[in-house]
Structure formats: C-alpha cells, structure tokens
Amino acid sequence: MTRKVAIYGKGGIGKSTTTQNTAAALAYFHDKKVFTHGCDPKADSTRLILGGKPEETLMDMVRDKGAEKITNDDVIKKGFLDIQCVESGGPEPGVGCAGRGVITAIDLMEENGAYTDDLDFVFFDDLGDVVCGGFAMPIRDGKAQEVYIVASGEMMAIYAANNICKGLVKYAKQSAVGLGGIICNSRKVDGERESVEEFTAAIGTKMIHFVPRDNIVQKAEFNKKTVTEFAPEENQAKEYGELARKIIENDEFVIPKPLTMDQLEDMVVKYGIAD
C-alpha cells in the first residue's frame, strides 16, 4: 500500500532539501519507489532529484492548455533512480491564490491516476506553516495520512512546528492524519538536540531523526544533486539513509498536543533559544 506523506515546517528550514534527500535515500539505500509532489509556487521541491528546475509547472500547463488536455506524461518527470516528480507551481505573481493551485494540482493528479499502487511513498512538500486551506489540503482532505515536521533548535522553527500541530489537531479527526515525528534539521545552535527532544515529548511525539549540519549538502545542491547521488559514500548520505529507514519502520502516528504560548516561552527561556 502506498504511504502518502506530507512534509511541513517553517519557511527556510530546509523542507525541500530534507524531502528530496530522504526520497533519494529511500530509493538508493532501501530500493523504494517514490513520487515527490512539490506544493510550493517556487517550484524548487524537485530540482535536486531532476538536476534542475522543470521548465514548466503543472499550473503553467493548466493555463496554457487547460486541465482537461493535460496528461501524466506532460507533467511527471523522472529523475534520480526513476523518482517521479511533479511541481504544482502557482499563479502569475500578484494574481490569484497559490493555495488554490495546490488544490487544483493534487486533484488533477488524482483524476489522472498519477499516484499508482506500485509506489511505496508519495511525498507532498508543502509551503511553510499551515497558513491557508490550500496548503493544508494534503492533511485537510486526507490526501496524506502521515505528517513529518522539519524543525531545528531555533525559536521560530519551534514556534512554527507548534502552529503546524494546531492545524493537525483541527484536521486529524476528519482526515485520519497523524504526526509521525519531528525531523531536526540541525542549525548547530546550543542545546539543539535537547530542546527539540523536550518539545517533541511535550507535544506527544518523537524526534524521528537528528540530521547533522554538513557542508556536503550545500556542495551537492550547487551541483543540482541530492547528497545520495552526489556523494553516497559520505556520512551525510548515510544519515539520510537512516532517516529513510526510520520512516519506513515508523508505525506511531499521533494527534499532537500543541503547547500554549506560556509553555513555549518557558522552554525558550530554559534553553536560551531567544538569546
């Protein structure tokens, strides 16, 4: 059965990098068949897998051809180890609603049977916090059953993760979606592992993996590749392989218990995150 996973987190935290490196590790180290659906108007959710951004997004094609004329072959691109990729894209700058574009794109992919039964994983790489109904669609309408939040030990990353948990609580009962854990994408701040572990325990989940900071990630990105494709022998590739393994084996999905603002402030003060 295909597992459908939504990835959320604060803007700039490294969601797309983490998602693509995890997808590559699933394919390379664990022989999994993966589909990555980018739900960000920037259309940068698949560039490391494809070796560059696609020339046209799904929404570009909808505007040019009309949704009824679009086929899977038009929009699905294959990259590293045959990982399938789609970028939703968005409206023209200053016009329309990007969240609405996500809804249109996912609906169209489902209507066209893009998420085939032979896939092991479908990833939805979502824009930032759950700030509007469109970007919340993967969890709101049950498109994804599993959610992982990318965070770090930085104050705003923790705040964003807590807000995302509030959105999960709102939609969990109607869509049967659960939080699989927090992925700590390290920024090398003081007490990072401890603060994220305390936060995850407080909201009723776990830190599924601590991804260390390593310059090899940036080197791979400069070459438009995931770490696994660029340097599979490096320790960082093995870290993503371990994260992939934990996701494969994970069977604990919860409705989180978001913290109050006072509880968050207390934790921030305790770990000096606000310094």
UniProtKB/Swiss-Prot annotation:
Question: Single Gene Ontology BP term?
Answer: nitrogen fixation
Question: Per the annotation, how and in what number is the cofactor bound?
Answer: Binds 1 [4Fe-4S] cluster per dimer.
UniProt binding sites for ATP = G9, K10, G11, G12, I13, G14, K15, S16
Q: Mind listing the GO molecular function terms for this protein? A: 4 iron, 4 sulfur cluster binding; ATP binding; metal ion binding; nitrogenase activity
Q: Please describe the post-translational modifications of this protein.
A: The reversible ADP-ribosylation of Arg-100 inactivates the nitrogenase reductase and regulates nitrogenase activity.
The enzyme's E.C. designation: 1.18.6.1
Reproduce the miscellaneous comment text.
Answer: This subunit is associated with the iron-iron nitrogenase component 2 (the third type of nitrogenase).
Q: What is this protein called?
A: Nitrogenase iron protein 3
